[in-house]
Amino acid sequence: MISSNDFRTGTTIELDGQVWRVVEFLHVKPGKGSAFVRTKLKSVQSGNVVEKTFRAGEQVQQAILEKSNLQHTYVESGDYVFMDMTSFEETSLTSEQIGKGAKYLKEGMEVNVIFHNGKVLEVELPISITLKVTETDPGVKGDTASGGTKPAILETGAQVMVPLFISVGEMIRVDTRNDSYLGREN
């Protein structure tokens, strides 16, 4: 159990059968009446955000999460197989469990997988990864002045918008949180 007074950004709690992460919190002490804690909670499973108010000192069940460092080894019949880097056990995850980050997975990539009561809650990819451009329109000389972008398909099949000067075969850095181009990789 954790007191609402001990809430911090990133704290995970169990509420109404779901696991929630505290995104924002504010301790309020009104001039009249008792103190309370106003929070913004994000569901770890669905991503929904709700605002909830707790009485000061209210006890809430804290969610115990386990974080494992796993390495993506191969894909078997649509499932992604990962190996635990410490125990060498294999774990198979579906693309639904991985989420939108599945399009960036390549063999040998290490990810953090968060478990709650033995169930996968979240797969955390590295914030930026380096991938090879396999398909894009050729750049035309003089196009760079406008600052435009064009679609490019990467080695994993993911599609991102890149500047016009990027060509096939180049290695680029991509932000996995918002699918944006970060720069060339030397």
From Swiss-Prot:
Stated role: Involved in peptide bond synthesis. Stimulates efficient translation and peptide-bond synthesis on native or reconstituted 70S ribosomes in vitro. Probably functions indirectly by altering the affinity of the ribosome for aminoacyl-tRNA, thus increasing their reactivity as acceptors for peptidyl transferase.
Q: In which pathway does it act?
A: Protein biosynthesis; polypeptide chain elongation
Organism (species): Prochlorococcus marinus (strain AS9601)
Pfam families noted in UniProt: EFP (PF01132), EFP_N (PF08207), Elong-fact-P_C (PF09285)
Q: Which HAMAP family match?
A: EF_P
Q: Please give the positions of the paired cysteines in each disulfide bond.
A: none
- What NCBIfam families does the record tag this protein with? efp, PRK00529.1
Q: Which SMART domains match?
A: EFP, Elong-fact-P_C
Name the protein family.
Answer: Belongs to the elongation factor P family.
Give the record's keywords alphabetically.
Answer: Cytoplasm, Elongation factor, Protein biosynthesis
What biological-process terms (Gene Ontology) are attached?
peptide biosynthetic process
Q: Which GO terms describe its molecular function?
A: translation elongation factor activity
Superkingdom? Bacteria
According to UniProt, the name of this protein is Elongation factor P
List localization entries: Cytoplasm
Database matches in InterPro entries: Elong-fact-P_C, NA-bd_OB-fold, Rib_uL2_dom2, Transl_elong_fac_P/YeiP, Transl_elong_KOW-like, Transl_elong_P/YeiP_cen, Transl_elong_P/YeiP_CS, Transl_elongation_fac_P
Q: Which GO terms describe its cellular component?
A: cytoplasm
